[in-house]
């Protein structure tokens, strides 16, 4: 499908590789690392033994309407959501495995008790030994959510050094320097990997449209502040068109209307 057409791999020296140009079975040799492209829209890094030791950083950039997965040199798997970026070393050296996330990523971390795996997301470090978790750190939100599926993670604020430790089924929310922890339905926050939107109880139209604009590459205008706060809850497949989703929300709430004009959608209240 066309969602995979625009992913870019940025090499350390500025070389840009359009990931849509590679079909399954392609292998790129880059010094000390082999990059395998496979047909499921994912890329895998593999260390070449005996190669020179320089560690380089690559960045995968996923645009609106896109998703991508990669397997890092240690075997850890990362799923990246639309409008997200991951900067990572081509192989892990030293005492830790550190990657840098903008946007949203779901991580299945390979166990290595000697080398903690750290996701740096804006003001927060998420530190793990081996686990499955989701980090949501989109820039406009000013909120960073870490949701733990299995294992154990420690989340810390790099400035205040405040720390939160999660057990499976918990989510920690970072907002302006402080953490709050709550029990959540984990599958709700990882639904995007299974091709679904999940709008939890009490989700406002502002929060919902933020997800929709990244996936459908559209922009929303609200006719009033009041409309922004209307709520809708439910699980909807991402294979639906934007118009089908608007129609579901209209029928369910019976108080809002979506008016589509090209890539701009106006959301108004039905008086």
PLM ranges: what are they?
Residues 1-271:
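A residue-level detector for the "anchor" residue at the start of short, highly conserved motifs
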């Amino acid at each position: 499908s066309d969602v995979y057409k625009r992913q870019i791999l940025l090499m350390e020296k500025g070389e840009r590789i359009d990931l849509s140009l590679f079909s399954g079975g392609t292998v790129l040799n880059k010094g000390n690392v082999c990059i395998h492209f496979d047909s499921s829209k994912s890329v895998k890094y593999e260390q070449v033994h005996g190669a020179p030791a320089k560690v380089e950083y690559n960045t995968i950039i996923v645009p609106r309407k896109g998703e991508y997965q990669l397997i890092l040199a240690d075997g850890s798997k990362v799923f990246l959501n639309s409008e997200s970026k991951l900067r990572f070393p081509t192989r892990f050296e030293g005492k830790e495995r550190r990657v840098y996330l903008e946007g949203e990523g779901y991580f299945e971390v390979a166990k290595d008790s000697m080398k903690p795996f750290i996701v740096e997301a804006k003001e927060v470090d998420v530190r793990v030994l081996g686990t499955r978790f989701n980090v949501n750190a989109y820039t406009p939100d000013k909120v960073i959510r870490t949701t733990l599926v299995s294992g154990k993670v420690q989340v810390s604020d790099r400035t205040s050094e405040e720390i939160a430790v999660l057990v499976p089924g918990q989510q920690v929310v970072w907002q302006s320097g402080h953490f709050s922890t709550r029990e959540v339905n984990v599958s709700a926050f990882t639904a995007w990997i299974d091709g679904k939107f999940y709008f939890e109880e009490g989700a406002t139209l502002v929060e919902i449209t933020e997800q929709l604009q990244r996936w459908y590459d559209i922009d929303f205008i609200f006719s009033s502040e009041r409309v922004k706060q209307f709520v809708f809850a439910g699980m909807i497949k991402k294979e639906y068109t934007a118009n089908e989703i608007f129609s579901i929300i209209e029928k369910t709430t019976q108080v809002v209307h979506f008016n589509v004009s090209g890539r701009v959608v106006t959301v108004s209240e039905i008086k």
